[in-house]
């Protein structure tokens, strides 16, 4: 009984750290099914400087493509800046390429939270294939 209770407490603690992100679509004709972020326990998600964030995306591809590129940007002082330290080539171990139109893909990416000033801002994630933009999502975040 005690082991079962400990197991439930651990599962509960871990699951509280992963949350479906509130996002708005921003283009592309692919289907963005879900975006989950960890660690995140609020809306908007609050990230600590110098830590890593894991983003889980489920999407349906709208095009056949030999490539899949991630373009992640964060708004700083009104300018869209690339998120530093991320792998932009999703075919390098994240997505099985070539991408096939109509197939569902689950992508997990790890992003370092830069040690910038504290701010509330917007992050934009785009997945781009050979024929252009496939999916795009925007979400508010807080960096502390």
Swiss-Prot record:
Per the UniProt entry, what are the Gene Ontology biological process annotations, in alphabetical order?
sterol transport
Question: Hey, what tissues is this thing expressed in?
Answer: Expressed in gut and hemolymph. Not expressed in salivary glands, ovarium or Malpighian tubes.
> What is the disulfide pattern of this chain?
26-136, 40-45, 91-97
One cellular component term from this protein's GO annotations in UniProt = extracellular space
Tell me yes or no: is Cytoplasm among this UniProt entry's keywords: no
Compartment(s) of residence: Secreted
Recorded GO MF terms: sterol binding
What drives induction of this protein's expression?
By feeding.
Say which domain of life the source belongs to: Eukaryota
Signal peptide from the UniProt entry: 1-16
One protein family per Pfam:
E1_DerP2_DerF2
Q: Which UniProt keywords apply?
A: Disulfide bond, Secreted, Signal
The similarity annotation says: Belongs to the NPC2 family.
Please explain the role this protein plays, according to its UniProt record: Binds human IgE in vitro, and may neutralize IgE antibodies present in blood from repeatedly tick-bitten people. Does not have antimicrobial activity against E.coli or M.luteus.
Q: Which PANTHER family match?
A: NIEMANN PICK TYPE C2 PROTEIN NPC2-RELATED, NPC INTRACELLULAR CHOLESTEROL TRANSPORTER 2
Q: What is this protein called?
A: Mite group 2 allergen-like Ixo r 2
Source organism per entry reads Ixodes ricinus
């Amino acid at each position: 009984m005690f082991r079962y209770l400990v197991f439930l407490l651990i599962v509960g603690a871990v699951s509280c750290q992963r949350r479906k992100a509130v996002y708005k679509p921003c283009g592309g004709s692919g289907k963005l099914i879900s975006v989950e972020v960890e660690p995140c326990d609020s809306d908007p998600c609050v990230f600590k400087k110098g830590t890593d964030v894991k983003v889980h995306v489920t999407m349906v591809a709208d095009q056949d493509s030999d490539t899949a590129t991630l373009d992640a940007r964060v708004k700083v002082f009104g300018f869209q800046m690339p998120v530093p330290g991320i792998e932009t080539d999703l075919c390098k171990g994240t997505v099985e390429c070539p991408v096939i139109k109509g197939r569902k893909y689950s992508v997990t990416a790890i992003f370092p939270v830069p040690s910038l000033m504290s701010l509330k801002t917007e992050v934009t994630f785009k997945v781009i294939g050979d024929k252009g933009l496939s999916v795009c999502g925007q979400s508010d975040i807080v960096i502390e």
